[in-house]
Amino acid sequence: MVASSKMMNVRVTTMDAELEFAIQQGTTGKQLFDQVVKTIGLREVWFFGLQYTDSKGDNTWIKLYKKVMSQDVQKGDPLLFKFRAKFYPEDVAEELIQDITLRLFYLQVKNAILSDEIYCPPETSVLLASYAVQARHGDYNKGTHVPGFLAKDRLLPQRVIDQHKMSKDEWENSITTWWQEHRGLLREDAMMEYLKIAQDLEMYGVNYFEIRNKKGTELWLGVDALGLNIYEKEDRLTPKIGFPWSEIRNISFNDRKFIIKPIDKKAPDFVFFAPRVRINKRILALCMGNHELYMRRRKPDTIDVQQMKAQARDEKNAKQQEREKLQLALAARERAEKKQQEYEDRLRSMQEEMERKQANLSEAQDTIRRLQEQLNQVQAAKEELEQRQNELHEMMQRLEETKNMEATERAKLEEEIRVKQLEMQKIQEEVTLKDSETKRLHEEVEEAIRKQVAKGSRAAAALQAATTTPKHHHVEEEEENEEELINGENGTQDFSKDFDTDEHIKDPVEERRTLAERNERLQDQLKALKQDLALSRDDTMETPNDKIHRENVRQGRDKYKTLREIRKGNTKRRVDQFENM
């Protein structure tokens, strides 16, 4: 993009995009701002502003009704601006309407937490990281989201990582465990849950300014959606004095002196000093904007806002219905894949069973072969026995025929007969033993064959059943899916969730509770995370904010309990307390 003598190149960076424009020399801040919001489709413009770095290196908000070129923007081509949230809602769930608004806030707050601009305790950091993963990647899928999947994602403040002796894999496992808890949560809903938890952090949405009281004590002034708070120099987590916007009647400054006039006319002015006049200008602009939004929230919505909310509800309902249809389709697919896997497992099991039976059959055949060999040996032994018996019979006949034989010859023949009888006895014993063994083997073979035939029939039947998908499953699944889809559509057609507001609350802090205090499940999650992280915590890496937070928790403080406490008493008492700090 080339700038002419009458045009200037401008680059505007949002939290997730870069936009480039060519503007005229006379273009005002509002004209540039309007061009940006039109390009990104943003309608909740009251929260946002254009930020630039001035010639002194400070971040400054562009003035809408002054020409861009007349403001103290660092010269360059292109001119650089950031599109950022300038004001924060009191309650994100009540006020944020458009998805684009939600996304921009989510990205800005997440970046502030990860860079430690907003202090976040370790257990809350891990829980927020799990919502961030859901917002980016959707539902956890074991097949897709394998170990190491989150390795390149920036999910935790470096402070938290340094304070725990845990590997990257251990951090990923911890975050993934909680990520799985968010299954079915829309990405936009995950962003909202993130912000609902983040807005209870003490430093969320607070703009801090260095100030001094009349005594010259260095302090912090915190400006946010709920009012003004005073902090000691070493503790930006725990405000010591607070003034809700409803108590403030007038704001002004004179040079470095800033004056706040309370509604209570008996109370003295609240006066402090800023280091530079330009700081007072920024404080004034933030006070005016936050006060205006504070009062606007307590009035009925304009027609434009009502239309935006109605449109957002319709879009959310339509998106929810599409989500439910998709979930039903995915569930049906998972059931079908599960059944298919079951059939494949059964088929594989039956095939393995058949292979085992085949192996057993081969073993039985080997046994039969050995039995046949044994039978052959028995038969051979019987034949040998019969031959020896014949030989003995012949010898007995010879003995009978040689009664008159000499004594020596007769004795020799008798000895041969005795030896032959012993051989026959031994062979007879072997035949008997082999006969018994053959009979036992024969019985075993018959039993094995009988069992093999029976099991083979059952295995064949099971194998046949496993390879044929029952038809009634298809019919049943189809009917179930159709019924579930119809029920799902009927269940969401009448569903509606309005952003409830109570315009009669004078000071919202009085009835405000942290999400953790209102949500027992969140309490349990944070408690479990804290216990898990304690096992690997390195106390030597504890920061001053960690110590302050730990002490606040020990004393039972949280953001809103502290705000209620510091707003007690009349305005005069609090102004006097400030002067004496």
Swiss-Prot record:
Gene3D superfamilies in alphabetical order: 1.20.5.450, 1.20.80.10, 6.10.360.10, Phosphatidylinositol 3-kinase Catalytic Subunit, Chain A, domain 1 (3.10.20.90), Pleckstrin-homology domain (PH domain)/Phosphotyrosine-binding domain (PTB) (2.30.29.30)
Keywords assigned: Actin-binding, Cell junction, Cell membrane, Cell projection, Cytoplasm, Cytoskeleton, Membrane, Phosphoprotein
SMART domains xrefs: B41 (SM00295), FERM_C (SM01196)
BP GO annotations: animal organ morphogenesis; establishment or maintenance of epithelial cell apical/basal polarity; neuron differentiation; positive regulation of early endosome to late endosome transport; positive regulation of protein localization to early endosome; regulation of cell shape; regulation of organelle assembly
UniProt feature, compositional bias: Basic and acidic residues: 495-519
SUPFAM superfamilies referenced in this protein's UniProt entry, alphabetically: Moesin tail domain (SSF48678), PH domain-like (SSF50729), Second domain of FERM (SSF47031), Ubiquitin-like (SSF54236)
PROSITE patterns xref list: FERM_1, FERM_2, FERM_3
Protein location: Cell junction, Adherens junction; Cell projection, Microvillus; Cell projection, Rhabdomere; Cell membrane
Gene Ontology molecular function: any one: actin binding
Start and end residues of each stretch annotated as Disordered: 452-519
Keyword Oxidoreductase among record annotations: no
Example of a GO cellular component annotation carried by this entry: microvillus
This protein's record includes keyword Flavoprotein: no
FERM domain mapped to chain residues: 8-298
Predominant location: other
Pfam families tied to this protein: ERM_C, ERM_helical, FERM_C, FERM_M, FERM_N
Residues recorded as bearing Phosphothreonine in the entry: T562
Function: Involved in connections of major cytoskeletal structures to the plasma membrane.
The protein, known as: Moesin/ezrin/radixin homolog 1
Species in which this protein is naturally found: Anopheles gambiae (African malaria mosquito)
Upper lineage: Eukaryota, Metazoa, Ecdysozoa, Arthropoda, Hexapoda
Gene: Moe
